[in-house]
Amino acid sequence: MMIDVFLIALLLSILTGNIKNVLKYNYKGLYLFAIPFVLQLLPWKEILVPLSFVMLFLFFIWNRNIPGFKLMAIGAVLNGFTMSVNGGKMPVWEPTLKLLNLDLDFKHTAFTEFSWKTLLADYIPVYLPWGRKFVISVGDILVFIGVFIFFVLKPRFQTQPSRVPHES
């Protein structure tokens, strides 16, 4: 679903002309954005998944002045914590999987009873108009909102004139 959200937000930013604003930011630690996704594909998930989320969190925190990144950081922390306490996999509520007729992939594990370890798991069903179905978490929702804020909202750069009247 992240790809869908990213592409929709990117398309909206192109259509609204806000894409030029996305390119103006001075990103810190940009390498920390790509590496975590590679780490999650490797074995040793109990170690590498938490490490990957720490790297993402650092990237978002170092760039917290960029609109949307704080929400993405919070969502990443929630998802990273949930995956970390569940052996490096995101738990998905089995009844929702059955409802949507979905199979698990290598990054997910099914659960049937809620506990403190599954409180922030994937249990929210999502149907997209083009036929794709997903189960998402509260952390995912925060990340998605952050992505839309980042791509779609017009940022306020420091080079803009101040709105505070000057005293004479």
Swiss-Prot record:
The chain crosses the membrane at residues 41-61, 133-153. It is a multi-pass membrane protein. It is found in: Cell membrane. Keywords: Cell membrane, Membrane, Transmembrane, Transmembrane helix. It comes from the Bacteria. GO terms for cellular component: plasma membrane. InterPro entries: DUF5317 (IPR035168). This is Uncharacterized protein TM_1467.1. The lineage of its organism: Bacteria, Thermotogati, Thermotogota, Thermotogae, Thermotogales.
